């Protein structure tokens, strides 16, 4: 969690706990939106929807590690977001998930969730989203809604083009997220 200069109406330095709760719902909602077509195509919509909603704000657990605290004030006073808030980390994690699961939909979902998180945070500034580069440390605010719309579109394409994946017993597998 960090003050969003690009979204000043979403945070309040006087109310860091309220800002943290707001950030959880914002990141969870955006994450669910960007992979909603894949979630809706799944047999376990509710479970996957909840996991996706939790996954969006879970990206911010790196703040807790960097601040060594769960206190919202400690999280807000970090100089910048941790280096794991980067496109490089998103791509590396996506590649690792794909190597382990061989699931394009699951891997895409991980990438879309993290990138949607980065889009929102980078529009607020102080985000080394192209780590290890220090600049640019933000994106134009309009890139956030455009990027989120493109992620949703790509998820729609992914959900409509992928055949149902089955495990060795012929059952739909977890990869059908």
Describe each PLM feature range.
Residues 1-177:
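N-terminal membrane-targeting hydrophobic helices
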